[in-house]
């Protein structure tokens, strides 16, 4: 599995406090039956091509000023249908439904299934002076993208 740790060195993760935690109170483990929504961002295609596009801004380069339109860029970079299908089918095999949302998959799942899928713990946070509607569900620590889909997934956001 691919370990995700917010970019901080693993040795420092135990001391890393997310910004939202400074303004919220950790109530503890979230109710495993509660449903949460999050997004899975799929890897874009043609990353090497994207990195070379900086040269369209350099007057000394032969591609200077050769800008592409949004549609052309999207057709060259959007995640492949095979990646959408692979991740969507994998989630479905785990009893998790997803819908396509642009270049991402929007997921609605129980906390229990989400924790099992990503090998993480999700806690419930509230704002100490807020109302019940101010509840936030966030993972505590790192998580792992399952190896079956790690070649397709760039980022998971929302928990």
UniProtKB/Swiss-Prot annotation:
Pfam families: Pro-kuma_activ. Induction: Down-regulated in grlA-null cells at 16 hours of starvation. This is Uncharacterized protein DDB_G0291952. Transmembrane segments: none annotated. SMART domains: Pro-kuma_activ. It comes from Dictyostelium discoideum (Social amoeba). GO terms for molecular function: serine-type peptidase activity.
């Amino acid at each position: 599995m691919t370990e995700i740790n917010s970019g901080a060195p693993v040795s420092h993760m135990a001391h890393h406090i997310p910004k939202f935690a400074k303004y919220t109170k950790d109530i503890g483990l979230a109710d495993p039956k509660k449903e949460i929504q999050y997004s899975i961002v799929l890897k874009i295609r043609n990353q090497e091509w994207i990195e070379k596009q900086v040269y369209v801004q350099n007057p000394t380069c032969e591609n200077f000023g050769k800008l592409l339109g949004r549609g052309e860029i999207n057709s060259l970079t959007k995640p492949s249908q095979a990646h959408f299908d692979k991740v969507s089918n994998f989630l479905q095999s785990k009893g998790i439904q997803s819908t396509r949302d642009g270049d991402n998959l929007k997921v609605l799942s129980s906390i229990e299934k989400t924790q099992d899928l990503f090998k993480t713990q999700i806690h419930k946070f509230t704002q100490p002076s807020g109302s019940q509607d101010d509840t936030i569900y966030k993972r505590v620590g790192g998580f792992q993208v399952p190896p079956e889909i790690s070649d397709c997934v760039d980022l998971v956001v929302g928990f």
